[in-house]
């Protein structure tokens, strides 16, 4: 970006929190990721729209990083604008419906539902990430998923406009939604829940959290579950059968606690993650004949 355009950015986007050449590993769950040219934290939809329209006007690429939980940002970073929704985190309850902005913490949203004795969101009680990412990926666990409770979502189009998509038009599948094809970005989502008993809801959330603590390597940085569940199999079991628990490349290893996770144990890099993912796919294929498909998203530029 030239000096004139930089001056225009500071003038047009005055008042918006924008950081230049900001290392993204400070914000990702994996603790890896190179710099973003411009990292923006809009406080509301108006600021978000200003950022997107400025970027489009100057042909600057832009993307929303969300909560950065189920993704890997490459070591070369991301060109253009990276937008984070940390400040777009409102949660509201209206009757049996919960509406949350895209940056709202998923776990916090389940706690709000519990506080109001609303049932249906318990499955997400321990899933890290944001509402936006959860809808984008159709997050789920223990028999529940976002598709079961979503009513509608407001999305930001590539032009910077906002429109509403009904749940029936989201084309949900296993860890999939139509947004992965359209490139539109979740702004907020509305969920339909049912009245329940507060103590029972709280007990179920605590039970699921306890299961996660027992099974998942929460003590290390990670990107969550790395692979989708292959039909008729469990990814973690296939990885164990290939004797890959504890298998390590650089600072990243297959968790010894849960083989479906890869953890950053010693200043690992995005390249370590990518190399380990590729190695695990190859060795599981050789051992079982099953080709694992990554669930985690990998974005950004490789380091030259």
Swiss-Prot record:
Gene Ontology CC terms: cytosol
Catalyzed reactions: UDP-N-acetyl-alpha-D-muramate + NADP(+) = UDP-N-acetyl-3-O-(1-carboxyvinyl)-alpha-D-glucosamine + NADPH + H(+)
Disulfide bonds: none
Class of enzymatic activity (EC top level): oxidoreductase
UniProt-listed Enzyme Commission number(s): 1.3.1.98
Active site: 175, 225 (proton donor), 295
PROSITE patterns recorded: FAD_PCMH
Residue span(s) of domain FAD-binding PCMH-type: 31-196
GO molecular function: FAD binding; UDP-N-acetylmuramate dehydrogenase activity
PANTHER family cross-referenced by the UniProt entry: UDP-N-ACETYLENOLPYRUVOYLGLUCOSAMINE REDUCTASE
Family that this chain belongs to: Belongs to the MurB family.
General function of this protein: Cell wall formation.
Protein name in the entry: UDP-N-acetylenolpyruvoylglucosamine reductase
Gene: murB
